[in-house]
Protein backbone atom coordinates (compact mmCIF):
# COMPACT_ATOMS: atom_id res chain seq x y z
CA UNK A 1 0.00 0.00 0.00
CA UNK A 2 1.30 3.44 -0.98
CA UNK A 3 -0.51 6.49 0.40
CA UNK A 4 0.06 9.74 -1.45
CA UNK A 5 -0.37 13.26 -0.10
CA UNK A 6 0.40 15.78 -2.84
CA UNK A 7 2.13 16.41 -6.16
CA UNK A 8 5.39 18.06 -5.08
CA UNK A 9 8.42 16.21 -6.41
CA UNK A 10 9.83 15.46 -2.96
CA UNK A 11 6.62 13.50 -2.23
CA UNK A 12 5.70 12.04 -5.63
CA UNK A 13 8.04 10.89 -8.38
CA UNK A 14 6.30 9.59 -11.54
CA UNK A 15 9.28 7.38 -12.50
CA UNK A 16 9.25 5.77 -9.05
CA UNK A 17 5.47 5.24 -9.24
CA UNK A 18 5.84 3.65 -12.69
CA UNK A 19 8.66 1.35 -11.50
CA UNK A 20 6.78 0.30 -8.36
CA UNK A 21 3.65 -0.36 -10.40
CA UNK A 22 5.56 -2.61 -12.82
CA UNK A 23 7.57 -4.43 -10.14
CA UNK A 24 4.57 -4.94 -7.86
CA UNK A 25 1.42 -5.08 -9.99
CA UNK A 26 -0.81 -5.96 -7.00
CA UNK A 27 0.29 -2.87 -5.05
CA UNK A 28 -2.59 -0.58 -3.99
CA UNK A 29 -2.37 3.22 -4.23
CA UNK A 30 -4.48 5.29 -1.82
CA UNK A 31 -4.94 8.95 -2.67
CA UNK A 32 -7.26 11.91 -2.93
CA UNK A 33 -8.73 13.01 -6.25
CA UNK A 34 -5.90 15.44 -7.04
CA UNK A 35 -3.36 12.60 -7.30
CA UNK A 36 -5.36 10.36 -9.66
CA UNK A 37 -4.26 12.10 -12.87
CA UNK A 38 -0.55 12.07 -11.99
CA UNK A 39 -0.76 8.37 -11.04
CA UNK A 40 -2.48 7.41 -14.29
CA UNK A 41 -0.01 9.53 -16.31
CA UNK A 42 2.81 7.66 -14.54
CA UNK A 43 1.37 4.37 -15.80
CA UNK A 44 -0.31 3.07 -12.66
CA UNK A 45 -3.30 0.82 -13.46
CA UNK A 46 -6.49 2.68 -12.50
CA UNK A 47 -7.89 -0.57 -11.03
CA UNK A 48 -5.16 -0.31 -8.36
CA UNK A 49 -5.97 3.30 -7.37
CA UNK A 50 -8.31 3.91 -4.43
CA UNK A 51 -9.67 7.46 -4.35
CA UNK A 52 -10.66 8.53 -0.84
CA UNK A 53 -12.29 11.87 -0.07
CA UNK A 54 -10.59 14.13 2.48
CA UNK A 55 -13.76 16.20 2.84
CA UNK A 56 -15.95 13.49 4.36
CA UNK A 57 -14.72 12.11 7.69
CA UNK A 58 -16.83 8.98 7.12
CA UNK A 59 -14.96 8.18 3.89
CA UNK A 60 -12.19 5.72 4.67
CA UNK A 61 -10.63 2.76 2.91
CA UNK A 62 -10.29 -0.64 4.51
CA UNK A 63 -7.29 -2.62 3.38
CA UNK A 64 -8.06 -6.10 4.69
CA UNK A 65 -5.37 -7.46 6.96
CA UNK A 66 -3.53 -4.15 6.92
CA UNK A 67 -5.30 -0.97 8.01
CA UNK A 68 -8.13 1.50 7.75
CA UNK A 69 -6.92 4.77 6.26
CA UNK A 70 -8.61 8.16 6.10
CA UNK A 71 -7.21 11.32 4.53
CA UNK A 72 -7.86 14.79 5.92
CA UNK A 73 -7.35 17.96 3.89
CA UNK A 74 -4.51 20.17 5.14
CA UNK A 75 -3.55 23.56 3.70
CA UNK A 76 -0.50 23.91 1.47
CA UNK A 77 0.29 25.67 -1.79
CA UNK A 78 -1.14 22.68 -3.69
CA UNK A 79 -3.96 20.30 -2.64
CA UNK A 80 -2.61 18.13 0.17
CA UNK A 81 -3.79 15.67 2.81
CA UNK A 82 -2.72 14.13 6.09
CA UNK A 83 -3.43 10.46 6.81
CA UNK A 84 -5.14 8.84 9.80
CA UNK A 85 -4.17 5.16 9.85
CA UNK A 86 -5.58 2.44 12.15
CA UNK A 87 -4.21 -1.10 11.97
CA UNK A 88 -6.70 -2.65 14.40
CA UNK A 89 -4.58 -1.94 17.47
CA UNK A 90 -2.73 1.32 16.96
CA UNK A 91 -3.47 4.74 15.49
CA UNK A 92 -0.96 6.68 13.38
CA UNK A 93 -1.22 10.28 12.16
CA UNK A 94 1.00 11.40 9.26
CA UNK A 95 1.26 14.99 8.01
CA UNK A 96 3.89 16.99 6.14
CA UNK A 97 3.93 20.17 4.09
CA UNK A 98 1.32 22.30 5.82
CA UNK A 99 1.41 25.70 7.47
CA UNK A 100 -1.02 24.64 10.20
CA UNK A 101 -2.74 21.67 11.79
CA UNK A 102 -5.34 23.93 13.39
CA UNK A 103 -8.69 22.15 13.52
CA UNK A 104 -7.17 18.69 12.96
CA UNK A 105 -8.10 16.19 15.67
CA UNK A 106 -6.05 13.07 16.36
CA UNK A 107 -6.46 12.61 20.12
CA UNK A 108 -4.31 10.07 21.95
CA UNK A 109 -2.97 8.35 18.84
CA UNK A 110 -0.10 5.96 19.36
CA UNK A 111 2.27 7.59 16.87
CA UNK A 112 2.42 11.00 15.23
CA UNK A 113 4.66 11.53 12.23
CA UNK A 114 4.58 15.26 11.47
CA UNK A 115 6.92 17.82 10.07
CA UNK A 116 8.92 20.24 12.17
CA UNK A 117 10.51 22.03 9.24
CA UNK A 118 12.29 24.86 11.05
CA UNK A 119 12.46 26.80 14.28
CA UNK A 120 11.05 30.30 14.12
CA UNK A 121 14.37 31.78 15.26
CA UNK A 122 16.33 29.89 12.59
CA UNK A 123 13.90 30.92 9.87
CA UNK A 124 14.02 34.57 10.91
CA UNK A 125 17.83 34.50 11.02
CA UNK A 126 18.02 33.00 7.52
CA UNK A 127 15.55 35.60 6.21
CA UNK A 128 17.53 38.45 7.73
CA UNK A 129 20.86 37.14 6.42
CA UNK A 130 19.47 36.87 2.90
CA UNK A 131 17.88 40.32 3.12
CA UNK A 132 21.21 41.80 4.23
CA UNK A 133 23.00 40.05 1.35
CA UNK A 134 20.37 41.18 -1.17
CA UNK A 135 19.48 37.56 -1.95
CA UNK A 136 16.10 36.01 -2.70
CA UNK A 137 14.52 34.43 0.38
CA UNK A 138 12.06 31.57 0.03
CA UNK A 139 11.77 31.41 3.83
CA UNK A 140 8.59 33.52 3.98
CA UNK A 141 6.83 30.98 1.75
CA UNK A 142 8.32 28.16 3.82
CA UNK A 143 6.79 29.66 6.96
CA UNK A 144 3.36 29.73 5.29
CA UNK A 145 3.56 26.17 3.95
CA UNK A 146 5.53 24.23 6.55
CA UNK A 147 5.10 23.69 10.29
CA UNK A 148 7.70 25.16 12.57
CA UNK A 149 9.02 23.00 15.39
CA UNK A 150 7.14 25.26 17.81
CA UNK A 151 3.85 24.80 15.93
CA UNK A 152 4.37 21.04 15.77
CA UNK A 153 5.10 20.79 19.49
CA UNK A 154 2.09 22.95 20.40
CA UNK A 155 -0.23 20.77 18.29
CA UNK A 156 1.27 17.57 19.71
CA UNK A 157 0.78 18.78 23.30
CA UNK A 158 -2.93 19.23 22.54
CA UNK A 159 -3.27 15.79 20.94
CA UNK A 160 -0.94 13.31 22.64
CA UNK A 161 -1.95 10.87 25.33
CA UNK A 162 0.37 9.53 28.06
CA UNK A 163 1.70 6.71 25.84
CA UNK A 164 1.85 8.58 22.54
CA UNK A 165 5.10 8.92 20.62
CA UNK A 166 6.12 11.24 17.81
CA UNK A 167 8.66 11.49 15.03
CA UNK A 168 9.51 14.82 13.43
CA UNK A 169 9.75 14.70 9.63
CA UNK A 170 10.72 17.06 6.82
CA UNK A 171 13.25 18.99 8.91
CA UNK A 172 15.18 21.74 7.16
CA UNK A 173 18.74 20.86 6.26
CA UNK A 174 20.98 23.86 5.63
CA UNK A 175 23.99 23.88 3.36
CA UNK A 176 26.36 21.17 4.50
CA UNK A 177 23.75 19.62 6.83
State where each predicted segment sits.
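Active-site metal-binding motif and surrounding structural segment of the metallo-beta-lactamase
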Residues: 1-31, 41
Amino acid sequence: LVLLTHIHSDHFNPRTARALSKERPALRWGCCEWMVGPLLEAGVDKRRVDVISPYNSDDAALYKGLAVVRPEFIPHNVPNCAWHIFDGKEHLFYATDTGTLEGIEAKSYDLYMIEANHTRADLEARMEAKRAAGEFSYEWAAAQNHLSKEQAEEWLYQQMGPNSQYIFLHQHQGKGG
